[in-house]
Amino acid sequence: MSDKASTPKKSATKDATKPKKVGDEEAKKREVKKNFDSYALYISRVLKSVFPDIGITLPSISVMDSFVRDIFERIAMDASSLTRNYQKSTLTTKEIETATKLILKGDLNKHAVSEGQSAVKRAQGQPTSGSKSR
């Protein structure tokens, strides 16, 4: 019994003697950054492009980030439900537009739909008519 008590556990000796790689810590940092989704950078960039002289505080960015996430999740959930209800396997711009109409009301809906349509046209390489370039 004294032999077993005096010998260290194999896993403890492997961990202690195992040399650490230089890239291990950097890889962990990159993993953390990958998993953290935030719109804060984009919110501040859009604000600076629209109003160059105005700044925004970190709590305000946090509120805006939460708002954007919430709206995104709502639109995604409604669009997904519409796709399932229509018994389709592909989510199209039609479902996104319909979900947006269900969530946003009034002028906000009109602006969101028109901006979304112009963004889709730009992505497809079609010229957009009547849209403002910022």
UniProtKB/Swiss-Prot annotation:
Stretches with biased composition (Polar residues): 1-10, 125-134
Gene3D superfamilies registered for this protein in UniProt: Histone, subunit A
Major subcellular site: nucleus
Region ranges (Disordered): 1-29, 113-134
Record carries keyword DNA-binding: yes
Molecular function, one GO term: protein heterodimerization activity
Coiled coil: none
GO cellular component, one term: nucleosome
PANTHER family: HISTONE H2B (PTHR23428)
Family indicated by similarity: Belongs to the histone H2B family.
Protein name, per record: Histone H2B
UniProt source species: Entamoeba invadens
